[in-house]
Amino acid sequence: MAKAVKSNGSQPLGRRTYKNPPITEATCEFQFTPVDNWNLAYTGIFLERVKARYSGKPREQRLLQLDSKQLPDASGTLPSASVREITKVQIPSADGREMVAVGPGILSAHVLKPYSGWETFRPQIEEALAVYQAIADPSGIRRIGIRYINLIELPAPNAEPSEYFSAPPTKNEELGCRLDTFVIRHEYLYDDEPIRLVVNFAKVQKIETVTVNGASYLLDLDVSREWQTEALPMNRAMSLVEELRRREREAFEAQITPKSRELFDA
């Protein structure tokens, strides 16, 4: 069950920048309405218009998406869900650090580590959105999501998670055992706006650093908003992107401690 959370509204926690941000991937995704005004010809046009920035080899991605009705309809019918297959074409940049993915009713922009900052990622999002809009002319937006995946590497394998994270996993020392690994998922709903925050927190093993004496933690934050009855006008897209990004920043800062911040600024 999702938990309700309060936003700081006009009093954000304050924007922080780090010398070594732990961000491994940042994503912004749009889902449009209608979803059936896209075809292979449009994909070709899109590829041509973004090739200056994304010159890598395109690849196809197929995935299943759960479409749910969040509220009962006028007859009182309970919420239902359906599954549909989405086919996207992913187009990376030459160095593979940036990517855009496009398909029927869906567009996403991605950037990988090293993250160069919101000042670089935001124009990338806006540019891709403008190209999609010029080609498909969607009537509106039904979902926007901002997702940041962070890999936080502690300096020692026995480093105490409670020193670096504000809500560490329980240790259960009274059972005579130690914590080996964990996966925690929390879903939150904001009180002021119908915005959902999903936090995935886990201890992970980096394959390429198995011999390094350290501990790695995944902190995955996904902030999204959906419009079920009336689509968001296209001219309001970037203002909502900014708002979701602001809340993602606040959520990230709320998950970590000053000791983590020292790591990011080392």
Each language-model region and where it sits:
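N-terminal low-complexity, intrinsically disordered segments
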Residues: 1-102
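Aromatic/basic-lined ligand-recognition segments
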Residues: 13-15, 83-95, 99, 110, ...
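Glycine-rich, often proline-containing surface loops adjacent to acidic residues and nearby aromatics
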Residues: 22-30, 98-115, 141-149, 213-226
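Conserved short hydrophobic interaction patches
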Residues: 49, 53, 124, 128-135, ...
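Short, highly charged C-terminal tails/helix-capping segments
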Residues: 75, 144-151, 256-266
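Hydrophobic alpha-helical segments and helix pairs
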Residues: 90-133
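Surface-exposed beta-loop interaction hotspot
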Residues: 119-154
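Long, compositionally biased interface segments
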Residues: 215-266
